[in-house]
Design a protein with these regions (language model features):
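Mobile genetic element proteins and their domesticated derivatives, centered on retroelements
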Residues: 8, 26, 32, 52, ...
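Mobile-element integrase/transposase regions
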Residues: 1-27, 33, 45-62, 89-90, ...
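C-terminal, beta-rich DNA-binding module of retroviral/retroelements integrases
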Residues: 143-201
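Short, solvent-exposed helix-loop connector elements
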Residues: 97-100, 118-133, 195-201
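RNase H-like two-metal-ion nuclease catalytic core shared by retroviral integrases
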Residues: 67-69, 73-89, 95-117, 131, ...
Length: 201
């Protein structure tokens, strides 16, 4: 467990009050344990990061988090790194991006999403709070009761245990040698250097 977590948004849909819901799901790749399923108002990093903060606090840190190339996991900037994935790196987690337009590379996660959609969103909940109650009930049943063929018909909870790598209370500051010159890299992967615009690759 915790060698690889997979994370993804299950698209979006409207709850019955007309508001959009974006379910963020995180799964342990080894045990298929559904660590989190949180309905959010958007895919913005300021909504996604607290979900990961809570999961890291409760379950510890994985070695790798595998995602697609969408927001907030990746960007078009240098190395496709997002603010979220840089935070993961500082925590000692390796972000792993699947190839664009190849969701089958996260196939186990996609299969879970089909089940989640069928059992919790048809029809959708009355509002985000009601929808979250459905996600919570699904997660409990999926983890603790539902047999899984790859686990010899045992539920995911039988094969999962939290990571021994704990979330640090504080990140160590980034330190550079004294002769380094620091520059802020823009969103289009460039810096100002000696009065010129330079693309950083």
């Amino acid at each position: 467990p915790n060698a690889i977590w997979t994370a993804d948004f299950k698209g979006q849909f409207r709850t019955r009050d007309g508001e959009y819901c974006y379910p963020l799901t995180v799964v342990d790749g080894y045990s298929r344990y559904l660590l989190g399923c949180q309905g959010l108002r958007s895919t913005a990093i300021d909504l996604a990061r607290p979900v990961f903060q809570r999961l890291f606090t409760e379950y510890g840190l994985p070695r790798i988090i595998r995602t697609d190339n969408g927001i907030p996991f990746a960007t078009t900037a240098l190395g496709r790194l997002s603010t979220l994935s840089v935070w993961w790196i500082r925590l000692g987690i390796t972000p792993e991006l699947i190839e664009p337009a190849h969701p089958e590379q996260n196939g186990r996660h996609e299969r879970m999403h089909r089940t989640l959609k069928a059992e919790t969103t048809r029809p959708p909940g009355g509002n985000l709070q009601a929808q979250q109650k459905r996600f919570n009930a699904f997660r409990l049943e999926y983890n603790d009761e539902r047999p899984h063929e790859a686990l010899n018909q045992e539920p995911p909870a039988s094969a999962y245990e939290p990571s021994s790598r704990e979330l640090p209370a504080k990140l160590a500051p980034i330190e550079y040698p004294g002769h380094f010159e620091m520059r802020l890299v823009s969103r289009n992967s460039g810096i100002r250097w000696k009065k010129h615009w330079v693309c950083v690759t």
